[in-house]
Amino acid sequence: MLGRDPIRARAKLGGVNAFAWQPDTGPLPVEAFSGKEVIFHLAGEPVAEGRWTAAKKRAIRESRVEGTRNLVSTLKSLEKRPAVLVVASVVGFYGDRGDEDLFEDSAPASTFLAEVCVAWEAEALKARDLGLRVATARTGIVMAPDGGALPRMLPPFRLGLGGQLGNGRQWMPWIHVDDVVGLLLHAARTEAVDGPMNVVSPNPVTNKVFTKTLGQALRRPAVLPVPRFGLKAAFGEMSQILMASQRALPKVAQNTRYNFRYPELRPALDACLSKDPTR
């Protein structure tokens, strides 16, 4: 494992073999690749945390684009290379697309985040020239008990203050964390997964439906909408990812016969909430 804090990683992951790496600062320690057949590259500055100041946007771009470039450069220097590179991307690649069905071959948007995704994935795909199969995992809104989007949503909903964002018509390409892991492993093991793969549930919902379902799961009312201008005032440019409508669908995963553990939203939320000690 490579990360910013290898000591913490070893403690948290049971003594895993961990190495220090700052993604945007240069090559990786080559000893980390010894005997490895698959590389999972998941590192990067969090996109949905904090306002997108100039410094934040620079950190997002450099950690992903430069980090991936540094990774591929290190792979090029190896005498024996891994066979597969799986790189995390995000559904922000597609931008705000209304009710359009979004598959892996849909065109990118021209927003800041989409442009980062295009550059990020392009750097990853250069590993094909080194003989690696490359999968870029465009990940949606992750539902997990202790990470992803859900824990940040819960406090107002628990108080009965939850509500839809704007008019609630925007599509949310959600995914349970167990299926994120499952799809990353599926990408690593499946030769037919080559290029982009949407890491999303086969059943996206609108924000209105999501809000209602989460309220029902918590047995709380969820009727206080958050206006678009309020999100813009609170989060600035970053609010675009909260309001973007992305009806992304997992065509590649389904065509390669991935079996979703949580294809429906309510069981996914119940599974997360059952592990939440504060519920």
What are the language-model segments listed below?
Residues 118, 130-132, 143-152, 187-197:
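Glycine/proline-rich active-site loop of Rossmann-fold NAD(P)-dependent oxidoreductases
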Residues 125, 154-163, 170-204:
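Alpha-helical substrate-binding/gating segment
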Residues 240-279:
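C-terminal amphipathic/interface module of NAD(P)-dependent oxidoreductases
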